[in-house]
From Swiss-Prot:
GO terms for cellular component: extracellular space. Interacts with nr1-A. GO terms for biological process: detection of nodal flow; determination of heart left/right asymmetry; determination of left/right symmetry; left/right axis specification; negative regulation of nodal signaling pathway; paraxial mesoderm development; sequestering of BMP in extracellular matrix; signal transduction involved in regulation of gene expression. Its main location: secreted. The keyword Disulfide bond applies. It is found in: Secreted. It comes from Xenopus laevis (African clawed frog). This is DAN domain family member 5. It comes from the Eukaryota. GO terms for molecular function: morphogen activity. Induction: Down-regulation during the establishment of embryonic left-right axis could be due to translation repression involving BICC1 and DICER1. Subsequently transcripts are degraded in a DICER1-dependent manner. Attenuated DAND5 expression lifts repression of NODAL and defines leftness by induction of the left lateral plate mesoderm NODAL signaling cascade.
Amino acid sequence: MLLFQATSLLALLCFTVRAFPFMEEEGSASFAQNVLHSRSFPVSHHGAFMDLPLFRQNRRKISQNFILHSDPREHMDEEALRRKLVWESAIRRDKMRSQPDQVLPIGQDALKRSRCHALPFIQNVFRKNCFPVRLPNKFCFGQCNSFYVPGWPAGLSQPCTSCAPSRSRRISLPLRCRSGHLAWQEVELVEECECETRYDRNTVEPAGSGEDYLPVS
């Protein structure tokens, strides 16, 4: 009886060694090294491991919930990105001073155009204790070339150009207030914009001109 049990145990041991040949000393060390260094399993074991029901279910959830998000600023050139950052900084500063919030939309195509021009937006016209009114309007946006000329006459201040309305009109807009009466608010409607050269607060000249002084070209 003891001899039969020993023979059965020896046969079982031989079968185990044949069934798992990769558990030899060299193969076992290689397998452990792969695990410690976070390498992938061999193809045969990796496929069987990932085909288990638990991993199939989790893999399906990951594939459904995983969405790639790309930053739109990655597709903008350096100059357009710089203008967008300056514009966003100006909007944040103005947002702290004005109420209700005023949104000035500006797209990538407008950022790539450097010259001053008019862009459409919806203006919030408001007054204290009155209901605001949303009015289609335009705002001026773009770059203007400023310059400094040595020898400029002492009586004239140095010019500075800015993007400003070149054609606009003013209207009176009625606002309905909480007390029941109407309040009239004057609003400027901008139609076109261009670069203007400013010498002081009260003097505005077309861009590139100077009174009694012509730079040598």
